[in-house]
Amino acid sequence: MARVTVEDAVDKVGNRFDLVLVASRRARQIATGGKDPLVDVENDKPTVIALREIEAGLITTDIMNTSDRAQQIQQDTAELDAVAAIVGGQQEELS
C-alpha cells in the first residue's frame, strides 16, 4: 500500500483547510456508496482513497463543487415534482 503524504495533496488543492473540506466530502461520497472510487481501493479506508484521488489530480475543488451542484439540482427537481403531484392530486379532489 502506497503512503499518501498530505503535502502532495495540499499542493493539488491549494491549502490544508480546503484539502480537509474536499477530502471529507469525497470520502463521504465513497463511504455511502454514492460514487465509485477513481483509484484502486487496495483495502484502504474512504479517507485515504479520497486523499489518493486528490493527490493523483482526479478530484479537485471545482469537480466537487460541480458534483454537489448537480446533485442539489437533481434533488430540487425531484422535490418540485413531488410537490406538483401532491398539488395536482388535491386539485382533482376539489373538483
Curated annotation (Swiss-Prot):
GO terms, molecular function: DNA binding; DNA-directed RNA polymerase activity
Recorded GO CC terms: DNA-directed RNA polymerase complex
Protein's GO biological process: DNA-templated transcription
Broad enzyme group: transferase
Protein's job: Promotes RNA polymerase assembly. Latches the N- and C-terminal regions of the beta' subunit thereby facilitating its interaction with the beta and alpha subunits.
Quaternary structure note: The RNAP catalytic core consists of 2 alpha, 1 beta, 1 beta' and 1 omega subunit. When a sigma factor is associated with the core the holoenzyme is formed, which can initiate transcription.
PANTHER family attached to this UniProt entry: DNA-DIRECTED RNA POLYMERASE SUBUNIT OMEGA (PTHR34476:SF1)
Protein name: DNA-directed RNA polymerase subunit omega
Annotated source species: Colwellia psychrerythraea (strain 34H / ATCC BAA-681) (Vibrio psychroerythus)
Lineage of the organism: Bacteria, Pseudomonadati, Pseudomonadota, Gammaproteobacteria, Alteromonadales
Gene name per UniProt: rpoZ
